[in-house]
Amino acid sequence: MGLLLLLLILTPLLAAYCHPDFRLLEKAQQLLQSTGSPYSTNCWLCTSSSSKTPGRAYPASSREWTTIEAELHISYQWDPNLKGLIRLANSLLSKVKQDFPDIRKEPPIFGPIFTNVNLIGIAPICVTAKRKDGTNVGTLPSTVCNVTLTVDPNQQTYQKYAHNQFHHQPRFPKPPNITFPQGTLLDKSTRFCQGRPSSCSTRNFWFQPADYNQCLQIPNLSSTAEWVLLDQTRNSLFWENKTKGANQSQTPCVQVLAGMTIATSYLSTSAVSEFSGTSVTSLFSFHISTCLKTQGAFYICGQSIHQCLPTNWTGTCTIGYVSPDIFIAPGNLSLPIPIYGNFHFPRVKRAIHLIPLLVGLGIVGSAGTGIAGIAKASFTYSQLSKEIANNIEAMAKTLTTVQEQIDSLAAVVLQNRRGLDMLTAAQGGICLALDEKCCFWVNQSGKVQDNIRQLLNRASTLQEQATQGWLNWEGTWKWFSWVLPFTGPLVSLLLLLLFGPCLLNLITQFVSSRLQATKLQMKLNKRVHPRNSQESPF
């Protein structure tokens, strides 16, 4: 009876219980309903959290190539034979940095973010860079590229760079040339690519339109009223709507195509003429790498996804968006994991003993390429964030150990160098004795330690976010699973203590009343039977 009362009391509470992940599931279902999807009811939204399952990449449309913004990062190296021109070279380098738009202050972190991603669909534009000594970032097959633009790696052309402190104007490398298969691009009037300033002020001729500028059209755009045009002077793409006139401004400060072509240059050298002749003196060389500034966009190179491309990169890449491998399964399909049913009913269709691994949905935009959003289960995201933080922290500790070993080795080498110089002091030192150039090691451990410190800060930030956001629910589930076996006995004892005296009193009164009724009946029987015996004729 106590168990029956317990079930009657707890059934409404269990029916009204709502797991916190129901909100994510409801949002996903509402998103399906708002898009008119036939799977808005009676279906499962699933995605795999396994690292072996490849993700999906969706190429950006031709028009999105004109709006996605990039940023540049410059690192430089002085020429060893600079000598007395160091002051002028430093002034020139400062001017070059000022004239470059949208310079990234923090050094980018290179390397693939994901390495097992499949491109879905055909990319309208791909960029290929081929250098024997380049850094390979991955190569897309030509079958998934509609138009492939190839960056010429052998270009060695220069242009004068205005600087009033030099007697002869310095020379500056021009942007690399872009080649493409004959007949893939269409010639258009020059007016469509002239007068297109960028959204930021720049004095660098790499980003300024020329007086005469050939304009080429990227074919196979969905709308006949819209064009995507290639500016070969600045290696930039423009979106053109023929119904709105020719003077349509460029949106990004540095376009993604311009950043990709500039980053293919290796040791771009600035040189100045010493005399009126043809001899030149090199001042400094600089590396330019590029990153995507627009959030959510990535470089898709083969099966690798990158946020930044290093200097002298090689491979075939496009740009696009990334999502996990998400699928929609019909409701009658047997799934390998338990998951929740319809959220509008108070009862649960399947047993709640595991939360969903991951729930999400990516909606492709009007061009069929953009991703509107991805929803994830809270608990899985929390665990993933913790794992990433732990991996970053472990990597930082490993880098610290390696750097300490390098510092120790450098100290030993320098000590040996001093000893050899002392032994060969009569000959002018070890370098003069060997008749070779002297090489000195420059310790970069400070920069490495700064990067390690940044990695540790990122790890601590991820751990704090995971703890603050999701630890309460995780702790609640652990506490609930521990207390649940004792809930039944505790509730039964509580009910017994609350209602036991009342029930005992009722039982006592009932027994007492029955006893009194029995005694009264017995007295009546004693009185009635003697009288009946006296009146009997027998």
Curated annotation (Swiss-Prot):
Localization (cell): Virion
Pfam families: TLV_coat
Membrane-traversing stretches: 479-499
GO biological process: syncytium formation; syncytium formation by plasma membrane fusion
Motif CX6CC per UniProt: ranges: 431-439
Annotated stretches, region: Fusion peptide: 354-374
Additional note from the record: This envelope is not fusogenic in a human cell system.
Family: Belongs to the gamma type-C retroviral envelope protein family. HERV class-I FRD env subfamily.
Oligomer and partners: The surface and transmembrane proteins form a heterodimer. They are attached by non-covalent interactions or by a labile interchain disulfide bond.
UniProt name for this protein: Syncytin-2
Organism field: Callithrix jacchus (White-tufted-ear marmoset)
Gene: ERVFRD-1
